[in-house]
Structures are given as C-alpha cells and as structure tokens.
Amino acid sequence: MFDMPIATQNPQTRPFSIVLLTYAAILAGLLAGAPMAHASGEIGQASGLPVPRFVSLKSDRVNVRGGPTKDHDVAWVFTRAGLPVEVTAEFENWRRIRDWEGAEGWVYHSLLSGRRTVVVTARSKDEVVPLNDGADAAAPVTARLQPGVIATVRRCTGTWCRISGPGFDGWAPQERLWGVYPNEKVD
C-alpha cells in the first residue's frame, strides 16, 4: 500500500554510526557494573531522587487521584499514616505511587515522607512473621507480626531488616516486608 520506506540511512554516515554504536556499547558495559540504588536507576526530573523509590504517607488522610492535577477525580483515600508506597513516576509536584496491593494513582508530593516504613507480608492470611532478636533465623523470636503491620525501617542488610513499631523491635526476613527492594541495604 505504501511504497515509502519507514527509515533510511545515508551511506556516508554509516562509519560514524558504527563508531557511535561501539562507544555506546562500551559505555553501557561500564555502567552495567556501577552500583544503582534501584533496578531502573532513573532520576526523577522534579525531585532529583531515584525513581522508583519507597516513601511513606505523612498523613492519616491522603487523596489519591486519577492524574497529576487537582482537576482529576479522587480515586480513593488512604487513611493510614506511615503506609509505605512506591514512587513510580513524577510530574511537577505530583508523584505516581503504587501501594502494597498494586493499586496506582497520583499524590501531591507534600503528602509523602522520605521516612522508610514497611508492611509485613505473609504467604497466607493466617501466617505470622517471626521477629528475631538478631539477623538470623536461629536468633530468639521476640514477637510474631500479623500481615498488614506497619513498621519503621531501622536497617537492612540485603536479607534481613531491623524494624520497630509500638511494642516491638527486631529483625525480620527482608523477603517478608513490602517497602524495601530485594537485596537493598538501608543504613
């Protein structure tokens, strides 16, 4: 139907393209070995902070909107301060966030805090997560946490996190916490 080519290349620029691609491949190889805070390694245009990243809700009432302006309808309201959310995008003063159940929406940046928190997760609703006295499954159990408990992150080793909350402080397996990335270290 269409006889026009989608893209054409000038034969005179071909050697330049090969050199450029070679340099790009070398640079990509060097950067692949560089440590990155998160899988994508992107920096948010609005904040200058990594995207994605975990933050927490500052308030007991946070409107989540369908888009990044007050003109967009409120899709739902969070009613739990300290809940961890993942910032997945930025637009001016708005942050697209994802909660631990996978729901996504837009929140005004001042309603978010850089304080790191986690939600305790379990493989079933009846399962509890042991909180140990040390970063070791053999360490004494100091508490058992129900799924949905919110805790403050004190430190993560990449496999264990020291967390605390009202009436508890100890170490939990990092894989059982939503609000920290796999293998992420937090000091």
Indicate residue ranges for each PLM-predicted region.
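N-terminal secretory signal peptides that target proteins for export/translocation
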Residues: 1-16
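Sec-dependent signal peptide recognition
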Residues: 17-24
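N-terminal signal peptide c-region/cleavage motif recognized by signal peptidases
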Residues: 33-35
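SH3-family beta-barrel domains
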Residues: 38-66, 77-81, 88-91, 98-100, ...
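Beta-strand-rich domains and repeat architectures in extracellular enzymes and scaffolds
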Residues: 73-74
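Surface-exposed aromatic
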Residues: 161
